[in-house]
């Protein structure tokens, strides 16, 4: 059976603001891929759909620019413009349905499915039903209250209840529908009097058909599911996608070597032995004998800038660009960080786009470290200033300059071209740009130790009033550049 794929994606996404200030809600990235693209690929891969109709409205040009004619994604995309997004989902379905004369699978564009069984939809669904509604087991009752439930009798749907106050059972309805052409003809009849004459709520309209005796059937979906309506829903979607395939992800540890030789080589070897690290990329200005000894070309790779004057930002970007992992961890070669914290970063990266360490938790700082007194207060001041300047993003930081951090490759790709700092300011700059990209950052306490004698030059080189002033200027300039962009 040749199926049409229908993806209504015209809504404004008000509840997801400011994420939807410049893109449609359906184009929000989930693990680096727009959710709408994920649904196009689901239709293509699980149901063999090659003819996809996308209803566009709010920021519709973003969708058209991304998909084009669909050939890049192995489908043919036809766009249906909805000039009246205020008329809600039924009007979008009506506009697209006027040109649909074949069975159609409709997925709501803001729903994310992970590990689903949509491939079984055609074989398992009632072939006589005009509408098949996908159901899935909810993890929490509040999920059901945000969606709908179906009332069954003899295996058929006889009613649909939108956002039930007291749901019974664990099943809830989803935005997966198998629709026969007759449904679109019925919708055309209801809109015969003009755009204002039709239904305003899709679930209520389906419920009226079910109560009138139109044959409808359920289909039991498996896997995990979230309807992306808010920032929290987007975070949940990212977690579900990343957690589903986390064990298959490769992790690269980028270790920035700042002039040391024997000491750095010892630390590189320790990180290479840490569970969860697939490769260590040691990046330095020039080739050093000790690093050459530990670099085996597979587990440990040595990358050099071939420039004795290369600054820290150059080394950082060079190492990250050369790393091959899906997950990128980053540290600096002054032997103050603990390899055992790698596991901590990997746990939190399931929930975040970037995880930044903080050296301000007193219980985890070795006595005698430089993170005390005026140095500690300076780091906290910069972090709190960032919170104030970007307060609407509800960020919480105490140490935005900490080098020890982890992030997804997709996050780095997003911010790469915006990193313009030339020296150690790149570390707070990365935090700023991830925030500006509206990605999620979590700060975690890490172990922090005293520097060995061979690394003491780091203190005099970077922990200066001049460095503080440069970071301060960076924060102010980036915030001023954001004025009017998302308020």
Describe the predicted segments one by one.
Residues 64, 72-149, 326-363:
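Conserved beta-loop-beta/alpha segment of the NTase-like Rossmann-fold superfamily
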Residues 1-21, 241-259:
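N-terminal nucleotide-binding beta1-loop-alpha1 segment
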Residues 214, 219-277, 283-289, 296, ...:
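Hydrophobic helical membrane-anchoring modules
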Residues 9, 13-16, 27, 33, ...:
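A structural helix-start
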Residues 2-7, 33-106, 279-305:
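Conserved N-terminal catalytic core of the sugar/cofactor nucleotidyltransferase
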Residues 145-155, 308-322, 339-420, 451-462:
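Acceptor/aglycone-binding surface of glycosyltransferases and processive sugar-polymer synthases
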Residues 122-123, 153-226, 231-235, 239-240, ...:
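Catalytic-core segments of class I nucleotidyltransferases/pyrophosphorylases
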Residues 114-193, 355, 360, 375-385, ...:
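Conserved core of the sugar-phosphate nucleotidyltransferase
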């Amino acid at each position: 059976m040749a199926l049409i794929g229908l993806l209504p994606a015209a809504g404004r996404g008000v509840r997801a603001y400011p994420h939807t200030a410049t893109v449609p809600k359906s184009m929000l990235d989930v693990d680096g891929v727009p959710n709408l693209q994920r649904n196009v690929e689901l239709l293509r891969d699980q149901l063999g759909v090659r003819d996809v109709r996308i209803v566009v409205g709010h920021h519709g040009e973003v969708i058209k620019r991304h998909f084009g004619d669909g050939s890049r994604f192995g489908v043919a995309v036809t766009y249906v413009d909805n000039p009246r997004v205020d008329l809600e989902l039924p009007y979008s379905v009506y506009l697209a349905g006027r040109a649909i004369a074949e069975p159609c699978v409709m997925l709501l564009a803001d729903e994310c499915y992970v590990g689903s069984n949509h491939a079984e939809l055609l074989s398992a669904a009632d072939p006589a039903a005009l509408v098949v509604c996908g159901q899935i087991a909810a993890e929490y009752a509040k999920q059901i209250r945000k969606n709908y439930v179906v009332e069954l009798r003899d295996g058929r749907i006889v009613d649909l209840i939108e956002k039930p106050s007291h749901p019974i059972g664990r099943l809830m309805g989803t935005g997966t529908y198998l629709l026969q052409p007759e449904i679109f003809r019925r919708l055309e009849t209801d809109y015969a009097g003009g755009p204002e004459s039709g239904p305003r709520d899709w679930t209520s309209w389906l419920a009226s058909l079910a109560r009138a005796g139109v044959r409808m059937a359920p289909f039991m979906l498996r896997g995990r599911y979230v309807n992306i309506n808010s920032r929290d829903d987007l975070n949940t979607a990212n977690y579900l996608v990343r957690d589903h395939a986390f064990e298959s992800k490769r992790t690269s540890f980028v270790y920035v070597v700042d002039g040391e030789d024997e000491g750095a080589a010892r630390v590189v070897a320790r990180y290479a032995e840490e569970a969860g690290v697939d490769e260590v990329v040691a990046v330095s200005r020039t080739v050093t004998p000790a690093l050459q000894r530990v670099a085996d070309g597979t587990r440990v790779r040595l990358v050099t800038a071939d420039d004795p004057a290369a600054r820290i930002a150059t080394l950082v970007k060079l190492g990250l660009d050369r790393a091959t992992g899906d997950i990128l961890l980053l540290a600096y070669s002054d032997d103050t960080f603990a390899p055992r914290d790698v596991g901590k970063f990997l746990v939190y990266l399931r929930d975040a786009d970037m995880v930044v360490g903080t050296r301000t938790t007193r219980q985890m700082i070795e006595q005698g470290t430089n993170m005390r007194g005026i140095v500690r207060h300076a780091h906290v001041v910069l972090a709190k200033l960032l919170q104030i300047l970007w307060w609407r993003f509800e960020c919480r930081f105490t140490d935005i300059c900490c080098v020890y951090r982890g992030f997804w490759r997709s996050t780095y790709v997003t911010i790469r071209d915006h990193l313009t700092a030339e020296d150690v300011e790149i570390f707070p700059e990365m935090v700023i740009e991830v925030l500006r990209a509206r990605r999620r950052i979590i700060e975690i306490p890490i172990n922090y130790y005293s520097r060995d004698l061979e690394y003491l030059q780091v203190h005099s080189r970077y922990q200066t009033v001049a460095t503080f002033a440069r970071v301060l200027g960076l924060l102010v300039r980036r915030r001023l550049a954001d004025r009017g962009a998302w308020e």
